[in-house]
Amino acid sequence: MSKKPKVGMWSGLTAVTAVLTAGAIVGTTVAFHYTTTVNNYLDADTYKIIKGDSDEDTEYFKSDFTSDEERESYEAELCAQVEAEGAALLKNDNNALPLASGAKVSLFGHGSVDLMYGGTGSGSVDTSKAPNFKQALEDQGIQVNSTLWDLYSSDDMMKNYSRITPAAISDTLEANTQYAVNEAPWSKLSSAESSFADYGDAAIVVFSRSGGEGADLPSGENGTNDSWIKGQEGDGNYLALSAEEKELLQNLKTLKDNGTFKKIIVLINSSNAIEMDFLNPEICGEDYGIDSAMWIGDVGQTGINGVAQLLAGEATPSGSLVDSYLYDNMANPAMYNFYTQAYPNAADYNLLTDGPDVQGMYSVYQEGIYLDYRYYETRYEDAVMGTGNAGDYNWSTTVAFPFGYGDSYTTFEYSDFNVTESADAFNVTLKVTNTGSTYSGKETVQLYFQSPYTDYDKANGIEKASAELCGFAKTDILAPGASETVNITVDKSELRTYDANNAKTYIVDAGDYYFTVAGSAHEAMNN
């Protein structure tokens, strides 16, 4: 008679132990990845301070503040100042801004009640104590349409027409693809329409977009992807206005034409470059009647106070764009490479599974230095001069607002431009005068240079831009008629170019180098 193997407690324990071991491995991995989140939730102490017997002062970095409250107050004021000096005025027809004292305005767009305060990842912002747009405007004496504000803030609107943004650094690739503008259709505003006339000094529209670390913008092959969500009427282009946003502008234009609203002001609440075709009727084919537009970026914890100061005229815009803004982002060749591509053999090595550490994707970087204004302005020069390989290129129908652009409520004049050379640097001085008659303000002075493009450069494939920013400075607040001498120092190393193919080091070509001050990269090219 054969013996039966003994199965019982030990085999059961083995199975249980195996399951527990697997669970412990998985749990440890997950817990390690979310260490900060878990510790914060459990209110766990992760360090201990042990004081020694020495009398040595170990506080090496002394605070300038006597209390946390004093520090927080300073930070709040600084954030507002950074926003007020960083926002860029894009257009201001008929001096639509600033608003008159005590103006009564209506705020439109879901972004007006749900601002982009910060980005994702390390760029996120604690909004628990952040002022909202209505509060900020009222602090400046501007009256806000409460009926419309309450409608946009209602549970129904917040539930059904809120911006959809993926959680940063999600566990799943799918979660990182869910984007939607999700602007409320005009019909949803009908219950507040009777209040518009009483708050008709201006219709202020806020267009917001999100995107950043761990929550990259929707992209697909050749720059678009119809599977990404854009809104109720999407074509895959998250950085263009949605159908509902265009409908909003169309109806506001009708109300402006019949006298309900005196002016339409648009605020671009995004650190990602939204397409600007809607600001130019000749480009988009429709006149939305927009009087003024301002780029405010992500406003930070208290930066919306700075925006309100600009709208009320308490501050004068002096910011400059740090990107070129296009009518159509597909005019940027880099867009054709900016999409998720998988290595051909990624699946063989299990590199396409969901998770925060997926390593199966790549992007092609083939533009060299020719990104943003270095591309647009270099191709512009080639097109004008008939050099290079510019092809059929029209700068004016491509670039809406160039790198460095930013208007003001006043005007400035430059004079007495002078360049002196030392052993290691060039020193540039010029006089800046506020030539306006009403508003005080600051001026951002931008210094650009152009280096010679030699036969050696061409033979060795050396990349050079037609204009390069090499320095900048901002004046103090200048009253009408006041002047200030600005000084900008440029280290000579800034003029170097990398020779990757022959010398394999930085070189400085012999020839003529030109410096110019300008209000944008494009203005520099035309100086």
Cite the ranges covered by each PLM segment.
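C-terminal non-catalytic regions of proteins with extracellular/luminal or membrane-system context
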Residues: 1-527
